[in-house]
């Protein structure tokens, strides 16, 4: 294990350190990493990058400045997030990549979702007739799906990039070697996972040096991750799917490196070498709806993001939100979200394994039938029943309720957005599912494995024909919603967010804020959020207006923080506006190649 945090003061000589103790604070030595200021908004030209992390944004911008395009920058930034935001993303996970090609005017998507091993059966998360406790399922080899992120990068660069994988990984490798300055968010996430990280020798050695999380202000280096990136640069991603890394991943899944004295039953996983060798990141058709004259593109199954955001937008388009006032606009947003989530839960899964009525879910006729259930006077009783996307729409309004579903989809994940001087745009959401994934670091490789398979429903939630039960080679349903909006065939904006199933409502609310309520994109991102996912109560951040909505019958529960979005808008002036969070998750980082 070659990954250690180092206090900034430790790089100084003892004399300098002694002087620092009695005088001014110590500055880092020349060449040592320094905490980078995060700017949540940047306006300019030549290209733009927005991520949650200043290092990742910097690396992406460097690629653009050297002549790379939006795809090159997206891969480089994502690889850097695997170093600086390792509890949310990395090569042990997966994601969804949405790309607008300025040369053709077309939108393409890559499905890099993690996949169930061939040995996984429908009852994989059931023991003695009872579902495995969720937290125990997460922290196990059983939860680990075949990673898709490395192949996503490879496919993206091969299809649309201009640089090699090795070139794309260079900046991230340097960050891993040089280190980054630990902030409070990193410390908090480590501390929240410390108990389960301590259960695995490889994880505790990397992330709990001396048995404790790294301190704020220390420099965290991950030389194992750098060496792993070097291996991928030299041998290509097949080193992970068919080469030396494959066996190491399978060993970690089948025989997790459990620390002595651990009392948790850490279940082994089912992954075999053949599962890695047969994995494919897939090019899929994007979802597409028209909203207020704009074309909105998203990710299709196995993500439910594009279909659910798209259905909700279709429902909202039946109402002139800009003319009815804030309370009614938010009321309709919450109701449309609940209706779309009911349909998501009932119908959406991996379309290679189940029949998903995607065209009907995104049809105007179905939206009109669902919209007629919304009353401006009172909130629907939640949870609402799913509709019938059968092509026979007579605007007959339903009113039935259904059983509530537990939502245990992990709130981790990260989203980045890039654009280049040619007008190409990427919206890319990637994840290892829960914060810290499965908790298992592949020994001496510097990265965590995902727990993506806990995104399957453990048992049937739909009274038959549940679309999201485990199956061999199946991809669990996702909520990731990378979204690109075109106006007249040209990019207007791109946006996405982490946050489990709240991703869908975060993206939907930002779109409504920007396109209907007249907010500029920075304000649309920063505005207080609420999420209604067909549950009895609405989870809302502080500052979200509740009183008048409560008078309509909406019930509220507190949620301190929902999502952590990034986006880019193409302004009328011809400039780019890159936007990240000003506060959530410690704030994000937006940058442009040439500031205005």
PLM feature segments, named:
Residues 1-16:
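N-terminal export and membrane-targeting signals
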Residues 20-37:
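C-terminal region of N-terminal signal peptides and the immediate post-cleavage residues
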Residues 32-58, 62, 70-235, 240-241, ...:
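Noncatalytic scaffold domains of N-terminal-nucleophile
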Residues 63-64, 151-159, 235-242, 247, ...:
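Alpha-helical support elements that line or immediately flank enzyme active sites
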Residues 83-109, 126, 259-272, 424-493, ...:
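Active-site rim segments in enzyme catalytic domains, especially the processed small/beta chain
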Residues 89-90, 94-101, 414-418, 482-484, ...:
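Short beta-strand scaffold segments in enzyme catalytic cores
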Residues 269, 321-431, 445:
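Internal maturation/activation junctions in enzymes
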Residues 422, 473-475, 507, 516-560:
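Extended C-terminal subregions enriched in glycine
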